[in-house]
Amino acid sequence: VRVLDSSPIQLKGYGYEWAKHNATRRCEGLKLHVEYDLGLESPTRVALSFPNFNDSSMGKQWPIETDIIYVFDKGYCDYDWWWSIHQKKAFFVSRLKVNAAISIEQKFETNENSPILEDGLFRFSNPKPRGGKKNLYTSLARRISVQREDKDPLILVTNLLDEPAEMIAQLYKSRWEIELFFKWIKQRLKIKKFLGKSENAVKIQLITAIIAYLLVFLFKNSHNQTTPLYLMLVWIKCNLEKPVLFNAFYLDKKPMSPEVKYLLETKT
């Protein structure tokens, strides 16, 4: 399962004048796009753009892999792109716009005790939804209405026609994992303050932060560590000038050689 989303990087004030030309009401700066693998708990693709670059346009630039389930929000609403996902034997789960023109083909029974309010198959009834642009998605799709506390029902759309509706709702709920990732890197890797103010300087610092995350993540997984990623990051920051101390993470699992023991005793 892969989750697609973006997060704004606000850049305002003296030195960031270059960011004003492509600003939106929501953001003046850059936008960080990420494809996040829920199984690996790690990003698989990362890109930067200006805020006025649509999320769906970035999604179109990334390759679609067979048998992968892609989860994304309404920012990626593009019927033709959804069709390309379907054609490549991949799957998607997203939100359906309230004003989407559809015709219901079949309704499924729902359990009274389930949060699933409605479940059924439909077709898009508008052949040209965007000012004359032909809608390529002509196959059946699935519409699921999910109850939410103190909010309007969540309307989901997917090409997973046979899976339980509850599972599909849970897949969309798991999209928040990528929000936690964005929050983690912004807080832990200090990408709210930048060393330089030029466009290249900001982009380099952002990409460097992602690389740092991936390196620590790979180190943690390759050594079967249970230490939280943040604690490992702090430990590494405090010992950048003592590379031999990286062995401290797994010295208890291997016999300590006399050379390593000597270095640890003399360099710490």
Residue ranges and their predicted role:
Residues 1-268:
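Single, function-defining residue in the core of a domain
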